[in-house]
Swiss-Prot record:
<dbReference type="GO" id="GO:0004612">
    <property type="term" value="F:phosphoenolpyruvate carboxykinase (ATP) activity"/>
</dbReference>
<dbReference type="Pfam" id="PF01293">
    <property type="entry name" value="PEPCK_ATP"/>
</dbReference>
<feature type="binding site">
    <location>
        <position position="56"/>
    </location>
    <ligand>
        <name>substrate</name>
    </ligand>
</feature>
<keyword id="KW-0210">Decarboxylase</keyword>
<comment type="function">
    <text>Involved in the gluconeogenesis. Catalyzes the conversion of oxaloacetate (OAA) to phosphoenolpyruvate (PEP) through direct phosphoryl transfer between the nucleoside triphosphate and OAA.</text>
</comment>
<dbReference type="GO" id="GO:0046872">
    <property type="term" value="F:metal ion binding"/>
</dbReference>
<feature type="binding site">
    <location>
        <position position="319"/>
    </location>
    <ligand>
        <name>ATP</name>
    </ligand>
</feature>
<keyword id="KW-0963">Cytoplasm</keyword>
<protein>
    <recommendedName>
        <fullName>Phosphoenolpyruvate carboxykinase (ATP)</fullName>
        <ecNumber>4.1.1.49</ecNumber>
    </recommendedName>
</protein>
<dbReference type="InterPro" id="IPR008210">
    <property type="entry name" value="PEP_carboxykinase_N"/>
</dbReference>
<keyword id="KW-0464">Manganese</keyword>
<keyword id="KW-0067">ATP-binding</keyword>
<feature type="binding site">
    <location>
        <begin position="233"/>
        <end position="241"/>
    </location>
    <ligand>
        <name>ATP</name>
    </ligand>
</feature>
<dbReference type="GO" id="GO:0005524">
    <property type="term" value="F:ATP binding"/>
</dbReference>
<keyword id="KW-0547">Nucleotide-binding</keyword>
<feature type="binding site">
    <location>
        <position position="198"/>
    </location>
    <ligand>
        <name>Mn(2+)</name>
    </ligand>
</feature>
<feature type="binding site">
    <location>
        <position position="198"/>
    </location>
    <ligand>
        <name>ATP</name>
    </ligand>
</feature>
Length: 528
């Protein structure tokens, strides 16, 4: 099928009698509950279960191999190729399936708060609660914007349509297929709403760098003086917690672009973890759970409708989606200037990385490409003990282009705007996981605040003998023995052995970046 035929099929679907376009939040909440998709909690949130899939399905995600784009994509485990024929056949089947539904729901909106690079999107849903999720997560249009809205990309989500692998050419009944040429994202066989969010992020990670804009998997906030800070880190490293600061305004919690204008949020909402959530620990998220919010897989009493955020019986990956306006202390619209401080967060279960260290540009690019952390229980199915993981650019599942494209852009931006990068270990200290202890959040907050306030810009440092990292000798409010990881271990020989082991893992992982400059490898990585 060519793009015209694809568009005609889509037009026919959207002109059907079963279409609900741009319903309001109360209308979607009503639909979700009356159709038996979800229930209302005592706080007024819409709560749904996602069945078998309570997280992303990376093995079922494909990109169509197309002449116009195939030479740009970094093909492999993340970007799995699939043929146009497979896409076309599934597209026809999904459209036919959706035409036969009693009701469909359409959201029209945007990705990217910077008007210069904004992407117009539409999301077509089988479920009303999925459409409410899209309404709250993406950027909502004004009446004027809606009147002239023409979608650049369309997400089509049909969770109850299941592929037949033997016939349809997929690996399982589930599929997330992106056609960059036809500007369609086709999702079937999974009810996990996060697939919609991350598929649009993937599109932005493809489009923005081609406009000279660095797309980033990070949270961002800004101080009263306009000083912007970015927080990179994988699940469980403290990105959301550390960027929620009462003295700084939130730009966004997960996806951003960095253009010549500054930093902007790609989304219009937040998608936060709720496992073990409490009003004391994370008041901003807790207070955002109200009418209009969408809860995923959170345990709830069927009679009182009171949520139990400590109950991970359905999954540890319980979530809430809400518009960013549900957070009090935000920048609206979600745009700000150029970052002064960049924080790379890692949860090191080896317990050997410093709690904070200053990075040179080469080290920043090296650690950005490495994207090291320890995978913690609950972020993916089957993970019960922390295990080391390297996720390129702190977001490899969402990067269609070669990693070096993003790393080189980061290096250029650091040079252009004089940003200082810090590596912050929120993981273990005084020993590895099981013998050491988790870094105190109060210490991490103090160190991050000192970095953002510029107190570490000219501080005296010592160089770590294994990783070459520059460790501040003093940070007010943090014991000096905590700052140097080797000093925090009682058994120095055990520390040396663990540090050497992790350095070896870094070196082994970095072999896949054969085409990066020698300066990044030699000046950025471990000394041993």
């Amino acid at each position: 099928m060519n793009s015209v035929e694809i568009a005609n099929e889509l037009k026919e679907l959207l002109n059907g009698g079963n279409i609900n376009v741009q319903l309001s939040v109360p209308q979607l909440a009503e639909k979700a509950t009356s159709r038996g998709e979800a229930m209302l909690t005592v706080d007024g949130a819409v709560r749904a279960e996602t069945g078998k899939y309570t997280g992303r399905s990376p093995k079922d995600k494909y990109t169509v191999e197309e002449e116009s784009t195939k030479d740009q994509i970094d093909w492999g485990k993340v970007n799995q190729p699939i043929s146009s024929e497979v896409f076309d056949n599934l597209y026809v089947k999904v459209i036919k399936y959706l035409k036969e539904r009693d009701e469909l729901f359409v959201f029209k909106g945007f990705a990217g708060a910077d008007k210069d690079s904004q992407l117009s999107i539409q999301v077509i849903n089988e479920y009303a609660w999925h459409n409410l999720f899209a309404h709250q997560l993406f950027i909502r249009p004004t009446k004027e914007e809606l009147a002239s809205h023409v979608a650049d990309f369309t997400v089509i989500s049909a969770p109850n349509f299941k592929a037949d692998p033997a016939v349809d050419g997929t690996a399982s009944e589930t599929f997330i297929i992106v056609s960059l040429e036809k500007k369609i994202i086709l999702i079937g066989g999974t009810e996990y709403a996060g697939e919609m969010k991350k598929s649009i992020f993937g599109i932005m990670n493809y489009l923005l760098p081609q406009q000279g804009i660095l797309s980033m998997h990070c949270s961002a906030n800004v101080g009263e003086a306009g000083d912007v800070a970015l927080f990179f880190g994988l699940s469980g490293t403290g990105k959301t917690t550390l960027s929620a600061d009462p003295d700084r305004k939130l730009i966004g919690d997960d996806e951003h672009g960095w253009s010549d204008n500054g930093v902007f949020n790609i989304e219009g909402g937040c998608y936060a973890k709720t496992i073990n959530l409490s009003a004391e620990k994370e008041p901003e998220i807790y207070n955002a759970i109200r009418f209009g919010s969408v809860l995923e897989n959170v345990a709830v009493d069927p009679e009182t409708r009171i949520c139990d955020y400590d109950d991970g019986s359905l999954t540890e990956n319980t979530r809430v989606a809400y518009p960013i306006q549900y957070i009090e202390n935000i920048v609206d619209p979600s745009v700000a200037g150029h970052p002064k401080t960049i924080i790379f967060l890692t949860a090191d279960a080896f317990g050997v990385l410093p709690p904070i260290s200053k990075l040179t540009k080469e080290q920043a690019m090296y650690h950005f490409l490495s994207g090291f952390t320890s995978k913690l229980a609950g972020t993916e199915r089957g993970v019960t003990e922390p295990e080391p993981v390297f996720s390129t650019c702190f977001g490899s599942p969402f990067l269609p282009l070669p990693a070096t494209v993003y790393a080189e852009m980061l290096g250029q931006k650091i040079d252009e705007h004089g940003a200082q990068v810090y590596l912050v270990n929120t993981g273990w200290t005084g020993g590895e996981y099981g013998t050491g202890s988790r870094m105190k959040l109060s210490y991490t907050r103090t160190m991050v605040r000192a970095a953002i306030d510029g107190k570490l810009t000219n501080v005296e440092t010592t160089q770590d003998a294994v990783f070459g990292l520059h460790i501040p000798t003093a940070v007010e409010g943090v014991p000096s023995q905590v700052l140097n990881p080797r000093e925090a271990w009682a058994d120095k020989a055990a520390y040396d052995a663990k540090a050497a082991e992790l350095a070896g893992l870094f070196n082994e992982n970095f072999k896949k970046f054969a085409n990066v400059s020698e300066a990044i490898t030699t000046l950025g990585g471990p000394l041993k």
